[in-house]
A protein has these predicted regions:
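Loop/turn elements at helix/coil->beta-strand transitions in domains of secreted/extracellular proteins
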Residues: 64-69, 98-103, 126-127, 135
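N-terminal targeting signals for export/organelle localization
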Residues: 2-46, 171
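Conserved redox-active cysteine motifs that mediate thiol-disulfide chemistry
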Residues: 72-87
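Thiol-based oxidoreductase modules, predominantly thioredoxin-like and allied folds used
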Residues: 48, 85, 89-113
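Active-site-proximal beta-strand/loop segments in catalytic clefts of secreted hydrolases
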Residues: 72-74, 105-108, 133-135, 144-145
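Non-catalytic, surface beta->alpha helical segment in thiol-disulfide oxidoreductase systems
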Residues: 125-171
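A short beta-strand-turn-helix
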Residues: 46-68
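Structural alpha/beta surface segment adjacent to cysteine/selenocysteine redox centers
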Residues: 112-126, 136
Length: 171
């Protein structure tokens, strides 16, 4: 009888040692290569109706139980283009689509669409500025919207970990 109990305890310990219980909790994509697309994307549509794009992303997120990723920037900004390139990597793009409804918001040279961020209490002082909302519309990365504004100094995995880390701490 004691041998069976010890065997069960050993089996549980082995499973725990393999990390199977923790693997399900971490859904961050793993960036297998650091090669970003070339040329880097130009993700911000200067002619877009940003308010309509944000409203549509929020509506889709609410309907689908996803988070919203609001990315404020400009095509002139290398950090913004690097962030967009990371989001387009094969190993990242699918997870982004499963987790987020994304709206890319052009701020020009800090002269337009700033009121959208201000509605969440964010004054845009650097780009990219990223606001993550949960499916109920709550701002989950408050205090850190410019964490990716130096994306060129970050490895792609660090960018992914930052974005998905905001989601995992919100759940």
């Amino acid at each position: 009888m004691a041998a069976k109990t010890l065997l069960k305890i050993a089996a549980i310990a082995a499973i725990a040692a393999l990390g199977l219980s923790g693997a399900a909790a971490d859904t961050r994509p793993r960036v297998l290569s650091a090669a970003l697309p070339t040329p880097l994307p130009l993700p911000y549509d200067e002619a877009a109706d940003a308010k309509a794009d944000v409203a549509a992303a929020i509506a889709r997120a609410k309907a689908n139980g996803k988070h919203v990723l609001l990315d404020f920037g400009g095509n002139w900004c290398p950090d913004c283009r690097i962030l967009a390139g990371v989001l387009e990597l094969d190993e990242v793009e699918g997870a982004v689509g499963e987790t987020f409804e994304v709206a890319m918001i052009d701020v020009g040279r800090f002269k337009k669409n700033l009121d959208i961020a201000e509605a969440y209490g964010v004054k845009i002082t650097a780009v990219p500025t990223v606001i993550i909302l949960d499916p109920q519309g709550r701002f989950v990365n408050a205090g850190h919207p410019t964490a990716l504004s130096n994306a060129r100094a970050m490895k792609p995995q660090a960018i992914v970990d930052t974005i998905f880390g905001w989601v995992s701490t919100a759940n």
